[in-house]
Regions:
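Conserved N-terminal substructure of TIR/SEFIR domains
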Residues: 1-68, 167-168
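C-terminal interaction surface of TIR/SEFIR-family domains
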Residues: 4-6, 123-168
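Short catalytic/ligand-binding loop motif for oxyanion handling, primarily in non-cytosolic enzymes
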Residues: 16-19, 78-82, 128-134
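Short, glycine/charged-enriched secondary-structure capping and boundary segments
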Residues: 22-25, 84-87, 135-137
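Secondary-structure junction/capping motif
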Residues: 36-38, 100-104, 133
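Proline-rich low-complexity regions
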Residues: 37, 118-121, 134-135
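Conserved beta-strand-loop-alpha-helix hinge of the TIR/SEFIR fold
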Residues: 62-110, 115-126
């Protein structure tokens, strides 16, 4: 039996690393009340020289241990193509039967939706723009929240309120 105790964070790790780092800082800091077990501590879902299918397999295993799903949306999230099988070095010789032309982010989002994980969407911006959100989660997320206030400062209280909605 798998115990779902983690929170899975999906993001364009190139363009929105600052937002991921901010969540991590709030999670690890003693001052803040944001507290979650990071699913990425289980195995790496980072793109490197590993076959894209192996990375997606690791991501799905991490998602299987996750109770919640957080998508960070930035300016290029919807256009990110990292993880498409056709971009994999082993595409022509790949023996995996579950090849998919979904990016890592699209794969993660669809997996979360198919497994009924509660989802929140955090925008690495001072406004919510649902047109930038991945299609599979835009209408099922419990909350869509901007991570920045009108002065482009990190908005902890709004993010915390969104996390609090996950448990409801």
């Amino acid at each position: 039996m798998i115990y779902r105790t983690r929170t899975y964070i999906a993001a364009d790790w190139t363009g929105d690393k600052d937002a991921v780092n901010q969540l991590t800082m709030w999670n690890e800091g003693k001052k803040w009340g944001l507290s979650f077990g990071d699913a990425h501590e289980l195995s790496s879902c980072r793109s490197d020289d590993t076959n894209n299918c192996n990375i997606k397999k690791n991501c799905s295993q991490n998602l299987d241990h996750s109770k919640y799903f957080v998508l960070i949306v930035g300016d290029k999230t919807k256009d990110t193509r990292a993880g498409y099988c056709m971009y994999c070095k082993a595409y022509n010789t790949c023996s995996y039967t579950y090849k998919t032309n979904k990016s890592f982010i699209e794969f993660e989002c669809k997996y979360a939706v198919n497994n009924n994980l509660p989802i929140i969407v955090l925008y690495n911006s001072n406004k919510v723009d649902k047109s930038k959100c991945i299609d599979s989660v835009v209408n099922v997320a419990k909350a869509h929240v901007a991570m920045n206030d009108n002065y482009n400062n990190w908005d902890y209280l709004s993010v915390k309120a969104a996390f609090d909605m996950l448990g409801k």
